[in-house]
């Protein structure tokens, strides 16, 4: 099957840790014999603006086209102000780049579109699906519902796109319930919770050190600049452990591939996942 994946997040040549959850999905689909192409719409921005968020690193000077592994990727640019105070600007921009994407695809025609994240990538996916006469599937990882629905500027657009997609995949039971509240029918909802691999189900090893005045290596497996990861709570935890007599060292991970994150989690004495938005074992 020919599948077009549309996503606001995807690994870039200078930021391979970006959008690893989408890259994992693409690899899985390719391993099953499907033919995949990726559209990763990027906001227009200057280099200094990348510092506002780790997922924006590499966006300003990203190439228009590149290959990630064996997958062809196009990165059309859209206009959008921070916080999307005027969604209509972004919508008009998505309408313009729809033609660019179709031109890039040429004679290659997908049979279905899978869209990771709803706003604003879902608007592009919806337009492409309508023009090609094919279904599109939206996937909600958390941000669209947890943050987007609370924003008066984007909530209406997210609700519109949720009801436009043919099927909606949610990665947790909580997000599944929110989708139902938005009017999505049970027949069009797919609940796909992230599985915990067998290696994480091993029993905790017996502690060999002293319970007091011994060094404890704590891993915060995410970029502290991402506010939703709640790095401050991890620091407070370390401070409390020090008050109780431990010698604490906290290590953070910035823009690391998931394989490295997993390896570090396996060797750390303690891994702290303090984010309230995680729906499965780790998006670093």
Give the residues covered by each predicted segment:
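N-terminal subdomain of nucleotide-sugar transferases
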Residues: 1-61, 65-67
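Short alpha-helical donor nucleotide-sugar binding micro-motif in glycosyltransferases
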Residues: 263-268
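A short, histidine- and acid-enriched strand-loop-helix "catalytic/donor-clamping" loop
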Residues: 11-13, 131-152, 164-167
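Aromatic "clamp/platform" in nucleotide-sugar-dependent glycosyltransferases that forms part
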Residues: 276
């Amino acid at each position: 099957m020919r599948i077009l994946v549309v996503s606001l997040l995807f690994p870039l040549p200078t930021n391979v840790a970006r959008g690893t959850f989408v890259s994992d999905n693409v690899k899985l689909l390719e391993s099953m014999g499907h033919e995949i192409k990726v559209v990763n719409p990027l906001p227009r921005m200057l280099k200094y603006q990348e510092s506002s968020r780790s997922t924006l690193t590499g966006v300003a000077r990203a190439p228009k086209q590149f290959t990630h592994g064996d997958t062809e990727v196009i990165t059309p640019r859209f206009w959008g102000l921070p916080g999307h105070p005027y969604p209509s600007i972004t919508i008009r921009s998505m309408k313009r780049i729809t033609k660019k994407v179709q031109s890039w695809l040429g004679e290659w025609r997908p049979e279905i579109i899978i869209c990771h994240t709803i706003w604003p990538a879902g608007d592009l996916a919806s337009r492409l699906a309508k023009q090609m006469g094919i279904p599109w599937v939206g996937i909600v990882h958390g941000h669209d519902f947890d943050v987007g629905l609370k924003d008066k500027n984007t909530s209406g657009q997210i609700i519109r796109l949720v009801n436009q997609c043919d099927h909606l995949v949610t990665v947790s039971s909580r997000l599944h319930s929110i989708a139902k509240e938005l009017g999505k029918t049970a027949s069009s909802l797919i609940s796909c919770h992230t599985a915990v691999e067998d290696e994480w189900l091993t029993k905790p090893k017996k502690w060999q050190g002293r319970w007091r005045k011994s060094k404890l290596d704590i891993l915060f497996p995410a970029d502290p600049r991402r506010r939703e990861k709640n790095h401050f709570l991890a620091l407070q935890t370390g401070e409390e452990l020090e008050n109780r007599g431990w010698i604490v060292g906290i290590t953070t991970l910035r823009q690391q591939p998931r394989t490295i994150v997993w390896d570090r989690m396996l060797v750390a004495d303690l891994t702290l996942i303090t984010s309230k938005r995680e729906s499965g074992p780790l998006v670093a």
